[in-house]
Amino acid sequence: MIDKINIPEFEVSEFNQAFKEVIESNFNYVRIKGEISEVKTATRGQIYLTLKDEDSILSGVIWDQKKKYLDINPEIGLEIIATGRITTWSRYKTTYQIDIDKIEIAGEGALLKLIEERKKRLQKKRLF
């Protein structure tokens, strides 16, 4: 049987705040490698995206004021390394995401593939 005396008890918001502090203090800046599987631009300008690998997904956001510093535009199917901070949000549903500061193409092969795809697209339009 579980001994309730030694188990901490929290209010929901109290637990969410504790969770936020643990996550955000232990994962200050991180680099996450994954494929972009979804991209949405909000009316206020921020970009919401989803990164995935074989087993998991992670939400990410690029705030409007940081978009001008990006070297590449996020596109579905692009394999990237996103650098940023892990943050939590618990207004209606507790979630965590990466607040992205920088995006890099993951590997030389992915970069060459991107260049080749763009070249073909421009050739179809007779611009290359």
Regions found by a protein language model. Give the residues of each.
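Acidic, two-metal ion nucleic-acid-processing modules in DNA metabolism proteins
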Residues: 1-128
